[in-house]
Amino acid sequence: MTVLDHAVVATDSTEVANLCKSLGAPVEMTSPDHPSGTDRVAEVADRSEYRGYDVIANVQGDEPLLKEAHVRATIDLVRDGTWEVGTCATPLNSDDARTDPTVVKLARAANGRALYFSRASIPYKRDERPVAEELEREPYLRHVGIYAYTREALNDWVALAPSQLERLESLEQLRPLEAGLRIGVTIVGAADPGVDTMADVLRMEEKLSAQGVPSFA
């Protein structure tokens, strides 16, 4: 991705690390004890060779088909100084996905500030009109697994202990949100679903195979 000055895989898995090395991909081994991906990213970002970077991006491993445009849009939220932390979301137009706990939903303010992330359906739809009828007025949003941080915000995030809401929802972004850190959300075009279940793994393998990507299983 040309939007990045440098990309590296951060992992605590020797299997993943060995595969990356065989493909010529930069990789950094980390502690196996991190409570979240952001904590893992912070460990690597604090190493001497990465301390010169002022904006750090975290592309999560369960978003293998993330588009470059989504990465760029997220980084731009932080790079222009508007937000300490940035992330992105895509319109959610399926009633089934709206109630699926593996699909993370979010609500944001008119200025783009994240109000809450949840596995539950937010905002709650009191009547039974199809979601698609309400998209233009107030879209339902699916969170896409990428973050950008200023170095200071990244350090502030990982200095916090895992929060009650973070533990309840198993969503790391609730930790800084609960502590008052401002998270900006940009809305992007359609994004491929993330990988959260074994069915998702099989679906993704089929899709990658159709694109000519070899299997490393």
Task: Label the predicted regions.
Residues 11-12, 53, 74, 83-88, ...:
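Structured catalytic cores of enzymes that bind and process phosphorylated ligands/cofactors
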Residues 131-217:
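Conserved alpha/beta core of the MobA/IspD/sugar-nucleotide pyrophosphorylase nucleotidyltransferase superfamily
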Residues 6, 26, 113, 182-184:
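Conserved beta-strand segments of alpha/beta enzyme cores
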Residues 8, 14-59, 63-73:
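Short phosphate-binding loop-to-helix
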Residues 67-163:
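Conserved core of the sugar-phosphate nucleotidyltransferase
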Residues 1-4:
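Short, acidic, metal-binding catalytic loop of nucleotide-sugar glycosyltransferases
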